[in-house]
Amino acid sequence: MYKKIFKEIKKYKIIVIARHIGVDPDAMASQIALRDSIKLTFPEKKVIAVGTGSAKFNFLGKLDKLEKFNNALLIVTDTPDRRRVDGPNVDDFDYAIKIDHHPFIEKFCDLELIEDTATSACEVIMKLIKNTGLKCNKEIAEVLFMGLVSDSNRFLFSSCTAETFNLVSEYLDEYKFDISPLYQQLYSRPLNEVRLEGYISLNMTVTENKLGYIKITDEIINKFGVDSASAGNLVNNFNFINEVLVWATITEDLKNDQIRVSIRSRGPGINHIAEKYHGGGHKQASGVKLKTFDEAMELMNDLDKFLAEYNSKEETLENGD
């Protein structure tokens, strides 16, 4: 499949690289690294990476303005379904390629590379570069590393395998980059975010079934001086609470007239419940966009019921019944 993708890349003089709405480091890093790799390999080609950016991730690189093209190739990274593509219309292109690591939802591109056991879209791009004639340099390798680290939550998730560590080791050895400043760029935070994290710790609801959740209203967002995306992303900071097995942030986003629910698990798969509410993602990291807090509480109730069943089964197994 890598060779097929490289063959299509060689064919086109104009290439547009997109990713999903609601930018995150892996999505942005994968498209920017792929853009820069193709430009390094084929300087004569016009290659752009598009979508709504975030000042928070400017250290990954700059995005380009979407233009109308004829006879162009579209590559979509880190996006499992058509409705979540940020910017371009897939049908406007001569040929489209998907490069993703999410569980399959729908086919919307001519050629699709889906590695749903990979940590990140960046890991898939790293393998694409390694197995084709695409070039890489220190700067591209750094961006890929940051995307992989972010989506694996610093190599925490079970999707991190020997292959993942071997791949990262090869890139570190070949491109000689220092990981310490990259971690600082990814994880340095303003004081107001840290204070909001403290508020969440104090006010999180925890059920007897080990579900933890917090409603972050627009009033709270303004009180702590953060944006909605940053508030919701704090979900990644609550991994190791003994009394919590599944946890969620329920964040009000007035700008987009929605309630964003980010769900994490350090045990059972929860993506099937997210899919029930027209969301999705990975087994241990999923998300949903809703219209009201009432809908979000229905989702929490479903998660709590699921956890009650899960815990009961685990207890039965432990007792050997």
Descriptions of predicted regions:
Residues L63-K65, D86-P88, E112-E115, G133-K135, ...:
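A generic local secondary-structure boundary/capping motif
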Residues Y2-N58, K65-A72, S150-D321:
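Hydrophobic helix-and-loop "lid/oligomerization" segment in the mid-to-C-terminal part
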Residues A49, V76, K98, L113-E115, ...:
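Structural signal for conserved beta-strand scaffold positions within catalytic alpha/beta enzyme cores
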Residues M1-K4, D78, I129-N131:
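Short, motif-level signal for alpha-helix interfacial/capping segments enriched in acidic residues
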Residues A33-R35, D91-D94, I114-E115, N166:
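Glycine-rich, phosphate-binding/catalytic loops in enzymes
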Residues H102-E170:
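Short alpha-helices
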Residues N58-L111:
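Active-site cofactor/cluster-binding pocket
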Residues E67-K68, N89-D91, I105-E106, C136-K138, ...:
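Solvent-exposed alpha-helices and their adjacent loops that cap or buttress functional pockets
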